[in-house]
Amino acid sequence: MCRISGEPMKKLLERLLWKQDPNVYMAKDSKLTPSLRTIDLIGLGTGMVVGTAIFTLPGIVAAEHTGPAVPLAFIVAAIGAGLSALAYAETSSVLPFAGSAFSWINVLFGEFFGWIAGWALLAEYFISVAFVASGWSAYMQGFLGSLGIRLPKALTGGFDPAHGSYVDILAALAILVVGILISQGLHQVSRIENTIVAIKLLVILMFIVVGATEIQAKNYVPFIPPHRPGTTFGGWQGILAGTAQIFIAYVGFDAIAANTAETRNPQKTMPRGLIGTLVLGTGFFIAVSLVLVGMFKYSRYANNAEPAAWALRHSGHYLTANLLSVVAIIGIFSALIAILLASSRLIYAFGRDGLLPKTLGVINDQHVPSHALWLITFLAMILGSVFPFTFLATLVSAGTLVAFIFVSLGIYALRPREGKDLPEAQFKMPWYPVLPAVSAIFSAVIFWGLNIDAKILMVGWFAIGLIIYFAYGLRHSIINQEHQK
């Protein structure tokens, strides 16, 4: 009796671990045009990394978790992201497919684990689109307010009847405009992105220089406030909580990897783009956050999604503040381009593999997965216009960390196959086999620092993912169809 009941379970477990042939991905992704260079990847990554979080998160994290020590949270997050970036760099140089961690884990560990990694990525990307649009809306409203233009209260934020807001109309419009832009083709998008990033970095440097003249040393004392029992503020507990929330800043290099199939010579170009983005972004994060908490006491940044422009206005630098707001509006818009682009490529990969309806894997005459693009665009419009900014930030970090853990552990399955049934890596994660484990543990510790609501919501998210996989994906996937032939 036990042997009979055990046989179906054994077959199911074997089925869940079926691995995809990398040549199948190479053939299906050949319709995508490889046009991205190193500078384009750094532009896309920096557009995301130095696009949203740098303009929106430092003030909120300082007020809610770290106090003046917010630069330490960025440094800790950078270490964790840097370790993961090394794993991403090696994996993307061997497996240059669309879909990033989803496709890689499918090849390395099997379809079930690939779906779990991909579902975590979808939480990261999908919610990131809404988060970025929400931050863009906050800056746009601040800029319009400085000109005496104010939207009706009901249209200025997520669904919060107690405070009179029902829908963030500007967030929804921003997502729609970016969806239209991306639908025109990747080459035009990358040119626009590079130009915006160059302007944005110049204005951030201007903020650092001007803001540094308003720093008051007393605002740094105490640099690490004492921990408040029962909260996630102060002490190293606060820094860990701040690090978990800040991790959203580093989804930029993850978004780069989603575009591997559209990259020229990805074996060399992708590692350069990943590491270049991380180094550049971290330097700007530390400088901006140090200046920001030095200008005003950290508590004054509570619930402020446009802290840099606010600090300049309240220190008398109105012209610079307005210039920063304009560039932030444009710069965060560029981040929206990068993350919506990555989101559509992930949905395309799900459709390509049959785990979601195959129509999502269709590529049009402009070499764009248009069905996937418009699905994620309209869903993100709903999410970004209804949910509040800080709620979205925490959820994005949770999805990011799960993906980082999978890719770091994936090195153990990848390295033995390099130079055999997979190409030799052009870049290798150093100190193997120790560093991949350190990277995975680091991300797991930061995940543990997330608030309980984020963990509960992620459990719910994965429950939905498992239902979709067992109800649809398991039977309709291309792996299943190939084995039935």
Regions picked out by a protein language model, each given a short descriptive name:
Residues 38, 166-172, 264-285, 302, ...:
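Loop-to-transmembrane helix boundary motifs in multi-pass membrane proteins
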Residues 142, 203-207, 347, 396-425, ...:
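Hydrophobic alpha-helical segments of multi-pass membrane transport proteins
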Residues 25-32, 71, 148-171, 195-326:
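Helix-loop-helix junctions that connect adjacent transmembrane segments
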Residues 163-167, 359-370, 404-455, 475-484:
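C-terminal membrane-solvent junction of multi-pass transporters and transport-like membrane proteins
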Residues 137, 166-217, 274-277, 393-406, ...:
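Membrane-interface loop-to-helix entry segments
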Residues 35-45, 110-123, 170-174, 231-246, ...:
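Select transmembrane alpha-helical segments in multipass membrane proteins
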Residues 60-63, 72-73, 82-175, 180, ...:
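Hydrophobic transmembrane alpha-helices that form the core helical bundles
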Residues 2-59, 63-68, 75, 81-86, ...:
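Membrane-interface "cap" regions at the ends of multi-pass membrane proteins
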